[in-house]
């Protein structure tokens, strides 16, 4: 299994257990699904509670959301109220990534710059449909992943987008 972590914060962003697609060599699109989980709900197969005693039950907590977000403890951020604030973040973040690439993979700098401009124009055009997520540390200096709902086979499906060059791949 591979875990993809933010190269700036070290936060776990996603794993290869989801359907992934690399777009224009710079964005991973990771397809998730909406799930509801109940914590604290104890069910024992074949268990028959006594009719004589009142069932005290357990405190069960329920959480719903995108499986990628829940499994990797991503945190929704509302830091970008408009396109302009998101564009400012992107420019700063891209500078950080270019600096990292120049150190670690200089051959990828031109690929990144060229393809990223194209991809970002497309993403900025859909800005109003996006939700934004940081890693568990909630550090906006690192990667801010995007989530958009797409109609896939008639079902509204969450698709998370992550910057390939902002990720460190670890094998487990």
From Swiss-Prot:
Keywords: Calcium, Cytoplasm. InterPro entries: Mss4-like_sf, Mss4/transl-control_tumour, TCTP, Translation_control_tumour_CS, Translational_control_tumour_p. The keyword Nucleotide-binding does not apply. GO terms for molecular function: calcium ion binding. Pfam families: TCTP. The keyword Translocase does not apply. Its main location: cytoplasm. It is found in: Cytoplasm. GO terms for cellular component: cytoplasm. Residues 1-172 form the TCTP domain. Belongs to the TCTP family. Involved in calcium binding and microtubule stabilization. This is Translationally-controlled tumor protein homolog.
């Amino acid at each position: 299994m591979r875990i993809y972590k933010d190269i700036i914060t070290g936060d776990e962003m996603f794993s290869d257990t989801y359907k992934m697609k690399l777009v224009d060599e710079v964005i991973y699109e990771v397809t998730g699904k909406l799930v509801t989980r109940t914590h604290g709900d104890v069910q024992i197969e074949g268990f028959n509670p006594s009719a004589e005693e009142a069932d005290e039950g357990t405190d069960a907590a329920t959480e719903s959301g995108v499986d990628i977000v829940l499994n990797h403890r991503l945190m929704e951020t509302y830091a970008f109220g408009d396109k302009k604030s998101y564009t400012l973040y992107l420019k700063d973040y891209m500078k950080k990534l270019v600096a990292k690439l120049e150190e670690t993979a200089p051959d990828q700098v031109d690929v990144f710059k060229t393809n990223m401009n194209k991809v970002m124009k497309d993403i900025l055009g859909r800005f109003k449909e996006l939700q934004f997520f940081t890693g568990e540390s909630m550090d906006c200096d690192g990667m801010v992943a995007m989530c958009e709902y797409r109609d896939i086979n008639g079902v509204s499906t969450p698709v998370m987008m992550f910057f390939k060059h902002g990720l460190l791949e670890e094998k487990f």
